[in-house]
């Protein structure tokens, strides 16, 4: 018996060193002490998750074999089996934890690479490799620097980059963008210009004669004229034109009488569009000095009431207003007597009456016409009053 105990003790001493201090140690140990017994799993981590799992399982199996009751002849085999089951469970937990850390460490970089590939694929298939373009090389280099960030903090540090001050790399990128825009503005000025500029360049084609005429006349228009100034002048021009009694068509025709080099007659629609501000900005600027010159000349002629035969007339040549014809009392009584006999005389009768009274034929004809209208108004004013008295007599 003593011999067998001694041999058992020798076997215990020759076995693997224990992580517990004594033979009759308690059956429960904390997880930290169990981890001290196990080899450090981080030493066995490799690039592949499968090799990591296989090595950890192998270490766990070696630990179980070292604590097997069959090898060291432990009499507390049941207690050791419980401890070994706890150790295996902790090892499995560690394996799952390292797998999760390994997966999370690979996800951000994988996402960033996918974003880069999708960014290049959306813009179409590249005609040349990215390395041939220095601009794309620099962008790729900046993305590689982002990939070198901490995987766990890369998703949070990417967002504030746009809010932070520009780094030298970003400043260089913005400088490249500005240079590209400058180059595009030289090659395609109409594409990068605003809506107003494009509209002006297009609408200037409609009336190129106006701009050429203004340049030939030496009326150098101010290209920086404020639109509000043009609007005020158009309204003032319209009011003064109406006050002078001149139509838009008359203004268009009278522009040819200004004798300005290259300035001819314009259509009524052009003057109308100027007053309604529907012309383009460039055409409004070109037409303003011409209309201003006409307005000053027209107001001067209307004020002076004189027409110089050598000076051009910018106002329409209207007929002189006919004076009102006054008929003397004796002729008037004779006409009334003729009207009482025949309210509608013939043309020959009107000519005979005019010759007898020494009046113009047209004057006699107009007098008979006016007298008929006067009698008609008198009759129409008397008839309703008579109808009213008649209806009242019947009691209606």
Curated annotation (Swiss-Prot):
Keywords: Activator, DNA-binding, Homeobox, Nucleus, Olfaction, Repressor, Sensory transduction, Transcription, Transcription regulation. Residues 320-377 bind DNA. Its main location: nucleus. GO terms for biological process: axon guidance; chemosensory jump behavior; dendrite guidance; dendrite morphogenesis; detection of chemical stimulus involved in sensory perception of smell; positive regulation of transcription by RNA polymerase II; regulation of transcription by RNA polymerase II; synaptic target recognition. It is found in: Nucleus. Residues 222-299 form the POU-specific domain. Residues 302-328 are annotated as: Disordered. Belongs to the POU transcription factor family. Class-4 subfamily. This is Inhibitory POU protein. It comes from Drosophila melanogaster (Fruit fly). The lineage of its organism: Eukaryota, Metazoa, Ecdysozoa, Arthropoda, Hexapoda.
């Amino acid at each position: 018996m003593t011999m067998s105990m001694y041999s058992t003790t020798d076997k215990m001493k020759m076995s693997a060193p224990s992580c517990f201090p004594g033979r009759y140690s308690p059956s429960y140990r904390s997880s930290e002490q169990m981890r001290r017994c196990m080899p450090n799993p981080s030493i066995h981590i490799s690039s592949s998750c499968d090799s990591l799992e296989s090595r950890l399982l192998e270490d766990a199996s070696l630990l179980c074999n070292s604590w097997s009751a069959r090898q060291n002849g432990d009499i507390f085999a049941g207690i050791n089996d419980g401890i070994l089951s706890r150790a295996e469970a902790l090892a499995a937990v560690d394996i799952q934890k390292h797998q999760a850390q390994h997966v999370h460490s690979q996800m951000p970089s994988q996402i960033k690479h996918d974003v880069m590939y999708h960014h290049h694929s959306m813009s179409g298939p590249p005609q040349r490799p990215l390395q041939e373009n220095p601009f794309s090389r620099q962008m790729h280099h900046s993305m590689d620097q982002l990939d070198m960030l901490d995987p766990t903090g890369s998703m949070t540090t990417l967002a504030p980059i746009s809010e932070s001050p520009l780094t030298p790399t970003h400043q260089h990128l913005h400088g490249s963008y500005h240079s590209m825009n400058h180059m595009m503005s030289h090659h395609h000025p109409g594409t990068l210009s605003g809506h107003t500029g494009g509209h002006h360049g297009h609408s200037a084609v409609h009336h190129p004669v106006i701009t050429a005429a203004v340049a030939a006349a030496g009326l150098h228009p101010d290209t920086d004229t404020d639109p509000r100034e043009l609007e005020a002048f158009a309204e003032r021009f319209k009011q003064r034109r109406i006050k002078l009694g001149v139509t838009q068509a008359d203004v268009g025709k009278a522009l040819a009488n200004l004798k300005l080099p290259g300035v001819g007659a314009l259509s009524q629609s052009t003057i109308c569009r100027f007053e309604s501000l529907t012309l383009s900005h460039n055409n409004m600027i070109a037409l303003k000095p011409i209309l201003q010159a006409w307005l000053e000349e027209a107001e001067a002629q209307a004020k002076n009431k004189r027409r110089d035969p050598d000076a051009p007339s910018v106002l329409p040549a209207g007929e002189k207003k006919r004076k009102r014809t006054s008929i003397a009392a004796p002729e008037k009584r004779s006409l009334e007597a003729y009207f009482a006999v025949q309210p509608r005389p013939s043309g020959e009768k009107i000519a005979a009456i005019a010759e007898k009274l020494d009046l113009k034929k047209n004057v006699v004809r107009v007098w008979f016409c006016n007298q008929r209208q006067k009698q008609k108004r008198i009759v129409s004013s008397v008839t309703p009053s008579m109808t009213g008295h008649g209806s009242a007599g019947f009691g209606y």
